[in-house]
Amino acid sequence: MRLKMFLLLALMLAVPAMAQRTGIKGIVVDSKTGVPVHGATVMLDGQGASATSTLDGSFVITDATAGSDVVLVFSYGYKDWSQDVVIESNRIVDVGTIRLTSTRSYDNAEFALTESQIEDEEGNSQTIATLTGATDNVFYQAASYDFSLMRFRIRGYDSEYTQTTINGVTMNDAARGRFNYSMLGGLNQAFKNKSIGMGLEATAYSFGDVGGANNIATYAKDYAPGTRASVAYTNGNYYLRGMITHATGLNKHGWALTASAAVRYSDQGIVPGSFYNSASLFLSLQKVFNPQHSLSLTAFGAPTSRAANTATYQEIYDILDNNLYNPSWGWQDGKKRNAKVVEAFDPTAIINWIWTPNDRLSLNTGVAVSKSFYSSSALNWYKSADPRPDYYRYLPSYYEDQDVKDLYTHKWLTDESFSQINWDALYQANYLNNLQAQETGEERGSTYILERRHSNQLNTSLNSTLNLRLNDYMTLQAGISARFSQASYYKTIKDLLGGRYWKDIDQFSERDYPNDYTLLQNDMNNPDRKVGKDDRFGYDYNINSIYATAWLQNVINLNHWDINYGLTMSYTQYQRDGKMRNGRSPENSYGKGEMHKFDNAGIKAGATYKIDGRNSISAHAYYGTKAPLFDKAYISPRIKDDAIADLQSERILSGDISYNFNYRRFHGTITGFWTDMYNQTERTSFYDDQFSTFMNYVLSGVKKTYKGVEVGLAYRLTPSITINAAGTFSRYQYKNRPTGTRSYENGQAPDTTQVVYLKNYYVGGTPQQAYSLGIKWNAPGMWFLELNGVYMADSYVSLSPVRHEAMPGLYKVCETEEELIQKTAEITRQERLNDNFVLNASIGKLIYLNRTASLNINLNVDNVLNNRNIQTSGYQQGRFDYTNFSTSKYPNKYYYAQGIKLYLNIGVKF
């Protein structure tokens, strides 16, 4: 297999050169940021010959007639550009770098990344930051901002299917395969130079993935010299953001420096009990030795602490008439204290050596080291009542007696020690344990604690990317990369809540097997261990992984055709290394486990037929395999080394076709796409009532289909007024009956497998319909106004596999076959979330203070109509009532968006 792939790669290198022709070539970039402008139309006015700029901004016209002509360049969002040119026979004339001036009178790099990017713990967000010069695709601009409110995912893909690089170095994490936007820390000015490869498009910096590829450039010499500062107010998860950036530009000694800092703060966010504290630093230093060699250093980090909210039941939202109710906090000493606090810090350093021996060859080699610290706190308890206020036994609906229902409803409405976490009661329970220990001499530890669940990573990455222009219309692009990663997972004690210690045993095993001393031990190497603040307990293991890949592609730009084709191959290995000998799996938990190895490959091709200078049709296709992420490969990694049986690589088949047009006043793209994914894995954990223990559940062999249509249109009514329309109608569905594996953490039963009936159910967590209609006005006096109406629909709750297994006992509670059918439909029903309409508005003013200084004022008002019923996501619980098969005992849980949201930014540049 590897030999065949190498031979294919070698064949791609042996592409014959073609005859020289007559024409022009050049590069189109944004005049302010220097970012390449992709999709700009370049025409020779007197001949009608044309070309479209590629992802790196380059273009070439090769069938021109010698003589004098005028080069015209136009692209949506930019002023038209023209210049006289003299074309020489049998020569491709280089017109150099064409700098287009943006028609946007505001700097949208000042706006924050969407909260779905910054704060999505599950890593499902795949929206794209709207950064200057990133893309002129109207649909992708709408998806990046307008649709993000309901956690819209482009084409339905999870973020692991989008590859993100910084200066060409891959930054997707090893465990979940995603790029973590929160590591950027809101440093929008520092990370504003972004190139986007949409879908299956070819890019110059990586092979990409089915969800596309993004590259963020942070080379110090590319930042405009000067200082930029801004302060912003918002009523979201934080209310204050300050940011300052200074760039020296490239001085006469070949040095360039850019530094940036930002803070985000809130002692009380829009969600009760939440807070947000983040400080960010960025440094980019570059030395240009000569036109051929330069060295760049980029370093950044953003230590962040934030209090999170938790999804809960619709019943509680309705009782309190508050869809932002948060069960994760309670009062302590007159202050709000949140039990779910996330702490994250991802310090990163990247070094790049750029070698450009001539104008046809460039080699970018980068090394990155990053250390990711991530933890989330949670309550834990031992032989005591559940302290969470939204525990199902505390709901009025749990009781049948109406008087009891009314009593619980009254307590929810009037008593915050009941409707929120009662911290005083938790401390009191532990104080009583201390008192009893003093009186009786019997050892008694904490009944309640606050624990911290850690998932850290140390990543070292190496990337090298080659761009070689073989001739005026053919470019060879290739790259190699390797990543070495160690992921560490463990728990520590954050707070004993007044108690003396915590006993490190499994309480479920102790309850079910009190006489089996071995079974209840979390670490047989340190049995019955008493742990205190900051001690590790419960579980402790590493996963060491290596990922290496090589890719190569050819890009051919002809007068009427743009063609690209490429191959990639990769090698993945990972291995669990347990630091505790767990009593439920004493022979398969401690030390290094089985090594899992995967060889994978992929091939993709694309072609664009340019009907004329303004209309084109493009198509892309991809087939490849991808190693399963180790975050989903292990069944119960906290307990043992067991992975999914017959673990296989994922297979992906994808294609799309687009019609593109780019007239001076009318611009747009219509795309149809289709993707099949085979052998996917999914993993979830929950408390299982049937066996009264914590359950790990893995789905394997999952097949999903993603298909739909995307439309993005922009019409310029006048030079200053533009109407935008964007939308998608899609279907994301499960297409088979995968295998489910249950693993019981108390060791009560061996792992079991069963068929899970998911075929034709929807992939949850994202709208499958989304539409926007907006108008932009760049008004006189450097004012701008924008109004957008957004409608999103067809979003479904995420499925729980236990509701889609065979239930042999179901017939016992059904008296007739008709009742059995109805009950089955009720259990397996997938709820559709609310459809929603949102109106967003923005206004801004740009004021030039003098020739070098300007003041920028922007006000965004999202959800102008104050719609408070927007369900951003929801999920079926893993817990299920196997006694009465009642769906109301453990109903779905939901997250809601806030109502009206303001974002006021004032920035100055000098």
Q: Positions of the model-derived regions?
A:
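Short acidic/polar hinge/loop motifs at secondary-structure boundaries
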Residues: 138-142, 169-200, 216-223, 325
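Acidic/polar loop-and-plug regions of large Gram-negative outer-membrane beta-barrel proteins
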Residues: 286, 294-352, 375-451, 515-533, ...
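Outer-membrane beta-barrel signature, preferentially recognizing the C-terminal barrel domain
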Residues: 324-348, 352, 543, 593-602, ...
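Short strand-turn segments of transmembrane beta-barrel domains in outer membranes
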Residues: 196-203, 212-249, 261-272, 788
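Gram-negative outer-membrane beta-barrel transporters
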Residues: 674-676, 697-802, 907
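Signature of Gram-negative outer-membrane beta-barrel scaffolds
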Residues: 449, 475-612, 637, 739
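Surface-exposed extracellular loop regions of Gram-negative outer-membrane beta-barrel proteins
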Residues: 305-307, 311-316, 520-521, 525-530, ...
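C-terminal beta-signal and adjacent terminal beta-strands/loops
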Residues: 677, 723, 791-814, 845-910
